[in-house]
Amino acid sequence: IVGGDECNINEHRFLVALYDPDGFFC
């Protein structure tokens, strides 16, 4: 999950960073 409206959600960004640091590009 990279880019798009999803990156505008802080909680989502945080969860993505924890789940897949290598895929955290927001």
From Swiss-Prot:
Keywords: Blood coagulation cascade activating toxin, Fibrinogenolytic toxin, Hemostasis impairing toxin, Hydrolase, Protease, Secreted, Serine protease, Toxin. Transmembrane segments: none annotated. It comes from the Eukaryota. GO terms for biological process: proteolysis. This is Thrombin-like enzyme LmrSP-3. Belongs to the peptidase S1 family. Snake venom subfamily. Its EC number is 3.4.21.-. Expressed by the venom gland. It comes from Lachesis muta rhombeata (Bushmaster). The keyword Protease applies. It is an enzyme of class 3 (hydrolase). One of its GO terms (cellular component) is extracellular region. It is found in: Secreted. Thrombin-like snake venom serine protease that cleaves alpha-chain of fibrinogen (FGA) releases only fibrinopeptide A. Shows coagulant, esterase and amidase activities. GO terms for molecular function: serine-type peptidase activity; toxin activity.
